[in-house]
Amino acid sequence: MLKATYDEANNCWRLNGVKRFITNGDANLHLVLARSEEGTHDGRGLSMFIYDKNDGGVDVRRIENKLGIHGSPTCELVYKNAKAELCGERKLGLIKYVMALMNGARLGIAAQSVGLSQAAYDEALAYAKDRKQFGKAIIEFPAVYDMLATIKAKLDAGRALLYQTSRYVDIYKALDDIARERKLTPEERQEQKRYAK
């Protein structure tokens, strides 16, 4: 676990420790979750920090060899007295900030999954139409056709769930923005409550 201590002489936070499986670990800016409260052992002792690579103090110990998503390196990072700035309020790192980031990331991961599923289905369908067995395309065999039909049904269900969830998020965010400008009507408040779930 990464530990954060306040450096009063330099009026900044210092990060020490190791972080493993960090997405985009080679980025110039890091949002880092670290234990800022001495003697705590749960999420209430964690705060969010911003680290700038130009300030030094962090080494990439290793880059994971992954099966996919090579454009986003997953790294193991070693922080040695790395200068950082507090992001937001102390003790809300996990409870407020990370959970908000994770909820947004989940929708993106769902979209990636639907895209990968579509590509896999397209490949399987093309192969089943092209591959000949006993003088006909294997898609004409009931077992193969049923397999492809099941894949397509699950793909369509996943896409529908993604689109509906995205719609809910968009409506909730729109109502949230409107609420900052003016008071919501009772109907809008009810709708906001419905989409917040």
Which residues fall in each region the model found?
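Short acidic, glycine/serine/threonine-rich loops at helix termini
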Residues: 1, 25-28, 42-44, 59-63, ...
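Flexible, glycine/threonine-enriched loop-and-boundary segments that flank and lead into catalytic domains
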Residues: 1-14, 18-29, 190-197
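Alpha-helical interface subdomain recognition
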Residues: 7-12, 78, 106-197
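A short core secondary-structure module
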Residues: 12, 16-58
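Beta-sheet entry/capping signal
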Residues: 12-13, 29-31, 45-48, 74-77, ...
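Single-stranded nucleic-acid-binding OB-fold domains
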Residues: 22, 65-69
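A glycine-rich, basic-preceded beta-loop-alpha segment at the flavin cofactor/substrate interface
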Residues: 54-57, 73-105, 122-140
